[in-house]
Amino acid sequence: MGPLWLDVAGYELSAEDREILQHPTVGGVILFGRNYHDNQQLLALNKAIRQAAKRPILIGVDQEGGRVQRFREGFSRIPPAQYYARAENGVELAEQGGWLMAAELIAHDVDLSFAPVLDMGFACKAIGNRAFGEDVQTVLKHSSAFLRGMKAVGMATTGKHFPGHGAVIADSHLETPYDERETIAQDMAIFRAQIEAGVLDAMMPAHVVYPHYDAQPASGSSYWLKQVLREELGFKGIVFSDDLSMEGAAVMGGPVERSHQALVAGCDMILICNKREAAVEVLDNLPIMEVPQAEALLKKQQFSYSELKRLERWQQASANMQRLIEQFSE
């Protein structure tokens, strides 16, 4: 499979989608709420994606919970990460949440949810209650449980947004945030611990500039991705860029320049979402390359949604998540 992830417009593939999915540079499709009507339609779409690609291809979605849950009707509601630490049995619930989220996606032939968020703190507009907590131990304890749940059902895990997006106020979807702190050791401690525990299969860096360390956003910085992530922390998994269509990546130039910089800096795979012209421009200008190691991220199990829903574990987890949402929703 190639390094580029892109999106498709609707419930079914167009002729253009089918043609693009055969391009050797394409390695993944990221789905959005607009791609989901009901359970059977989603299964049919994912089957069509795999057939059109004619080779292994990754299918992913942002389904972490709370406001970032693309598939809702017909799926269990997953709470924002912040809620787990507020509950008495929060660690147990976080593991159930990770398992439930991953299991329901696998039952619909989705390989990945880009989760969990390992950022610390609730102040950032882009993160807010997507974070598990405001201190290292709270984030570590609850994210570790969520990761255990995902792995138990056979979904690869993605830590984000390295080396920490939680301390900036600005939203990297809309602008490039600058983290002016002289040290981000506390934020880094979370990523370091999860890498050492061997529970992260992939990593997604932040479109954030940390000027005391490097002038480039982490997503396009060889300092962060090669020197720190690979060499210092010893991370061996896949590195995804965050969506290169986000304004946070604009300092790296146009679509081709952003893609080239991210790949040269150390990203293995790059995402270009909601801008088909930009994705095609990148396909036309990037040299063809393979990312065979990314096949390790394909889902590890196969089962139907009806089989899943018959499990007592599913019934219990789904009910518990709904109760948690009702308990803490404002």
Swiss-Prot record:
Its EC number is 3.2.1.52. Transmembrane segments: none annotated. InterPro entries: Beta_hexosaminidase_bac, Glyco_hydro_3_AS, Glyco_hydro_3_N, Glyco_hydro_3_N_sf, Glycoside_hydrolase_SF, NagZ_Beta-hexosaminidase. PROSITE patterns: GLYCOSYL_HYDROL_F3. This is Beta-hexosaminidase. Plays a role in peptidoglycan recycling by cleaving the terminal beta-1,4-linked N-acetylglucosamine (GlcNAc) from peptide-linked peptidoglycan fragments, giving rise to free GlcNAc, anhydro-N-acetylmuramic acid and anhydro-N-acetylmuramic acid-linked peptides. Plays a role in beta-lactam antibiotic resistance via its role in generating anhydro-N-acetylmuramic acid-linked peptides; these peptides function as signaling molecules that induce high-level expression of the beta-lactamase AmpC. The keyword Membrane does not apply. NCBIfam families: PRK05337.1. The record marks D171 as: Important for catalytic activity. GO terms for molecular function: beta-N-acetylglucosaminidase activity. It is an enzyme of class 3 (hydrolase). Monomer. It is found in: Cytoplasm. It comes from the Bacteria. The active site is at H173 (proton donor/acceptor), D242 (nucleophile). The lineage of its organism: Bacteria, Pseudomonadati, Pseudomonadota, Gammaproteobacteria, Vibrionales.
